[in-house]
UniProtKB/Swiss-Prot annotation:
One of the primary rRNA binding proteins, it binds specifically to the 5'-end of 16S ribosomal RNA. CDD domains: Ribosomal_uS17. Part of the 30S ribosomal subunit. One of its GO terms (molecular function) is rRNA binding. It comes from Maricaulis maris (strain MCS10). HAMAP family: Ribosomal_uS17_B. The keyword Membrane does not apply. This is Small ribosomal subunit protein uS17. GO terms for biological process: translation. The keyword RNA-binding applies. One of its GO terms (cellular component) is cytosolic small ribosomal subunit. Keywords: Ribonucleoprotein, Ribosomal protein, RNA-binding, rRNA-binding. It holds the Pfam family Ribosomal_S17. Belongs to the universal ribosomal protein uS17 family.
């Protein structure tokens, strides 16, 4: 099974080797037939502490690294 890859914006880089990425998704509400936006925050591993708040990044699933971290940064999104 391939690993999932998500794209989002770094909203926090305060943790050691950890960033928080906000991922936004849109979907059509089944009853209202209106496009709805939802966001979710993911803790991701950043080995080199290279990413700063506001960066667009891609994160990929990985084996659990801590209680909250199950994602790691792959690249900076264009």
């Amino acid at each position: 099974m391939p690993k999932r890859i998500l794209q989002g914006v770094v909203v926090s880089d305060k943790g050691a080797k950890t960033i928080v990425v906000r991922v936004e998704r849109t979907f059509l509400h089944p009853l209202l037939r209106k496009t709805v936006r939802r966001t979710k925050r993911y803790h991701a591993h950043d080995e080199a502490n290279a990413y700063k708040v506001g960066d667009q990044v891609q994160i990929q699933e990985c084996a659990p690294k801590s209680k909250l971290k199950r994602w790691e940064v792959v690249t900076v999104a264009a």
